[in-house]
Amino acid sequence: METISTRIVSLRKDAGLSQQQLADDLNLSRRAVSLWETGRRTPDIQSVLLLADYFQVSLDYLVKGSHA
């Protein structure tokens, strides 16, 4: 089942980025990115907005997986 965690991993890998590179680009810690990707934490709304803008995807896609 695809989740926000798996979508973050897929988007990051498709962009050819390491967790550290993504964290640096978004001014976040690598640990935060790691926790999101493993599903141990869910990104807050500000981080979700940052991720959607960074990867140029809709909030619907990032949160729910729909391409609306």
What are these regions (language model features)?
Residues 4, 8, 29, 58-59:
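Hydrophobic side chains within well-formed alpha-helices
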Residues 6-25, 50:
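Short basic helix-loop element that most often maps to the first helix and adjoining turn
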Residues 28-43, 64:
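Recognition helix of helix-turn-helix/homeodomain-like DNA-binding domains
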